């Protein structure tokens, strides 16, 4: 797990996998977009999927589109960090581009559920930093889902039921952010990322840096 990428202070460090999870409507997608737009050195993980490409989507940008046989080979050869089946389509995170990013000191953002997060921890626990986003109340969550005007009442009821199940996994996460205000929630998430980037064990160039500093002080 050696790293060769320079941090912003010139010290080499290994990148990290920054995971955001939340019930639908709690703000995960908005926070992910803000992080990608405003934080340097962070890229969004691009999943492989067997579902058909939709109008406006670009292969390699939105998803890596593959057929079912190719996906099966990727699973068999352990080429995916995590994968799941959703409505008869398979989705997964290719290992190689993530490893390349981490080794070069770049961080990768994951917008995934608790199951995907669990798989990431099993494959690379030391590289994973997980954040669970909570709404301030069930009433507020339901209001947000209605405000989006994307789903029928039946679909919203289903999302609320799933939210109760997803919430049962909150204690598996490293950090919890209650999204009462999107700007405040973003500031908290950004602070978490900044602190995790500075952790000693990720800054692989610190030993050499300190030795050089000691040498200078002794001369």
Curated annotation (Swiss-Prot):
Residues 15-194 form the Guanylate kinase-like domain. It is an enzyme of class 2 (transferase). One of its GO terms (cellular component) is cytosol. Its main location: cytoplasm. ATP binds at residues 22-29. It catalyses: GMP + ATP = GDP + ADP. Keywords: ATP-binding, Cytoplasm, Kinase, Nucleotide-binding, Transferase. Its EC number is 2.7.4.8. GO terms for molecular function: ATP binding; guanylate kinase activity. SMART domains: GuKc. The keyword DNA repair does not apply. It is found in: Cytoplasm. The keyword Kinase applies. PANTHER family: GUANYLATE KINASE, GUANYLATE KINASE-RELATED. Belongs to the guanylate kinase family. Essential for recycling GMP and indirectly, cGMP. This is Guanylate kinase. The lineage of its organism: Bacteria, Pseudomonadati, Pseudomonadota, Alphaproteobacteria, Hyphomicrobiales.
